[in-house]
């Protein structure tokens, strides 16, 4: 009995909507072609065989105090037996919180998708108490574009640079201690920010404690974050009992990392050509998220919800829906392996010899 085609607006579409909901993305998916996707090719992301699932997986770790970010990644590599893993933004040893760890194929885009805003909760200790109104007044001065020079103990060159602080909220203030919530651009040094605030106040200050509560699309209240002992227990259960249910909970499909990036859904017939370096032409577009803008980054996805890679949109969402020919997306980073979908383009025959 032949396998039935999967409705393009069925399981794959539901998975994409679930991915979008992680970061509150409510943009609509606008369909150009209402066609099915062939179940013989590719996988629904949550139904991949375990070895494939791990190759395209991520773990959102609640980093404990003590180990470095690199040590956390090394432990996860050893536990899972994967060859490659990488994290989405370094946390100092004493700092806790959200640390996304990409596995295997997902390491190709982790730096790109995580290089966005980050959010922290910070305990700042003033060296002398000040009036709360004065503190709030100075905190406002540090919203917007600020100048920073990396600390002495830093892995990057100590050159003056600008960073954007989107919001600083004073949550509590008691005696010399201020609890702050800071939403800022990636690469902002919180320790230096506290020191500069103390300098402007005229009393001095330093960072006492720090926790990252969001990086890119992942936050501590998303329901995706796990502890290292959760990972260890899931691996033991898998290796000793052959049960992978817990492992599939702690490792999530890497597609969640692009929940905030506008999406272009690709027809089955165009997927394999993208993995071979081709650009995406208008006839290969099945659907477009309404937030796609010309010149912006897009996530290329199959109708099953698999991430093919990232690209630069050469047309707006409406233009992609209306176009019948021409290149509409130029891929910048492909993560999907070759051979999951059929070759649908014609091979160019070599000219006959004279």
Curated annotation (Swiss-Prot):
Keyword flag Isomerase: yes
UniProt keyword Transcription regulation, yes or no: no
CDD domains cross-referenced by the UniProt entry: PUA_Cbf5 (cd21148)
InterPro entries assigned to the protein according to its UniProt record, in alphabetical order: Dyskerin-like, PsdUridine_synth_cat_dom_sf, PsdUridine_synth_N, PUA, PUA-like_sf, PUA_sf, tRNA_PsdUridine_synth_B_fam, TruB_arch
Gene Ontology terms, MF aspect: RNA binding; tRNA pseudouridine(55) synthase activity
Single Gene Ontology BP annotation: box H/ACA sno(s)RNA 3'-end processing
Xref: Gene3D superfamilies: Pseudouridine synthase, PUA domain
Catalytic activity: uridine(55) in tRNA = pseudouridine(55) in tRNA
Pfam family, one: DKCLD
PROSITE patterns: PUA
Similarity section: Belongs to the pseudouridine synthase TruB family. Type 2 subfamily.
Entry-linked HAMAP family: TruB_arch (MF_01081)
Xref: PANTHER family: CENTROMERE/MICROTUBULE BINDING PROTEIN CBF5, H_ACA RIBONUCLEOPROTEIN COMPLEX SUBUNIT DKC1
NCBIfam families assigned to the protein according to its UniProt record, in alphabetical order: CBF5 (TIGR00425), PRK04270.1 (NF003280)
Record protein name field: Probable tRNA pseudouridine synthase B
UniProt organism field: Aeropyrum pernix (strain ATCC 700893 / DSM 11879 / JCM 9820 / NBRC 100138 / K1)
């Amino acid at each position: 009995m032949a396998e039935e085609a999967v409705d393009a607006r069925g399981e794959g579409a539901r998975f994409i909507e679930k991915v979008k909901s992680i970061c509150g993305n409510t943009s609509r998916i606008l369909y150009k072609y209402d066609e099915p996707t062939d179940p013989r090719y590719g996988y629904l992301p949550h139904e991949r065989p375990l070895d494939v699932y791990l190759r395209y997986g991520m773990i959102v770790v609640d980093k404990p105090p003590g180990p470095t970010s690199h040590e956390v990644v090394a432990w996860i590599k050893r536990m899972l037996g994967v060859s490659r893993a990488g994290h989405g933004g370094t946390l100092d040893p004493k700092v806790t919180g959200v640390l996304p760890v990409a596995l295997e194929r997902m390491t190709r885009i982790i730096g790109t998708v995580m290089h966005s805003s980050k959010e922290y909760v910070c305990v700042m200790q003033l060296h002398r108490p000040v009036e709360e109104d004065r503190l709030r007044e100075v905190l406002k001065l540090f919203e917007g574009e600020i100048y920073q020079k990396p600390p002495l103990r830093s892995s990057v060159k100590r050159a003056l640079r600008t960073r954007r602080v989107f919001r600083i909220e004073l949550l509590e203030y008691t005696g010399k201690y201020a609890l702050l919530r800071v939403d800022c651009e990636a690469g902002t040094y919180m320790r230096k920010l506290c020191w500069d605030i103390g300098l402007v106040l005229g009393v001095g200050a330093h960072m006492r404690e720090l926790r990252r509560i969001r990086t890119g699309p992942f936050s501590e209240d998303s329901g995706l974050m796990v502890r290292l002992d959760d990972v260890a227990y899931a691996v033991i259960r898998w290796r000793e009992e052959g049960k992978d249910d817990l492992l599939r909970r702690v490792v999530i499909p890497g597609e969640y990392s692009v929940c905030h990036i506008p999406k272009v859904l690709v027809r089955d017939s165009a997927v394999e050509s993208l993995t071979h370096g081709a650009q995406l032409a208008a006839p290969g577009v099945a659907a477009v998220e309404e937030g796609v803008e010309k010149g912006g980054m897009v996530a290329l996805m199959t109708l099953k919800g698999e991430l093919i890679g990232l690209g630069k949109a050469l047309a707006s969402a409406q233009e992609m829906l209306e176009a019948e020919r021409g290149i509409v997306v130029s891929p910048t980073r492909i993560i999907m392996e070759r051979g999951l979908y059929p070759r649908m383009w014609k091979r160019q025959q070599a000219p006959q010899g004279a």
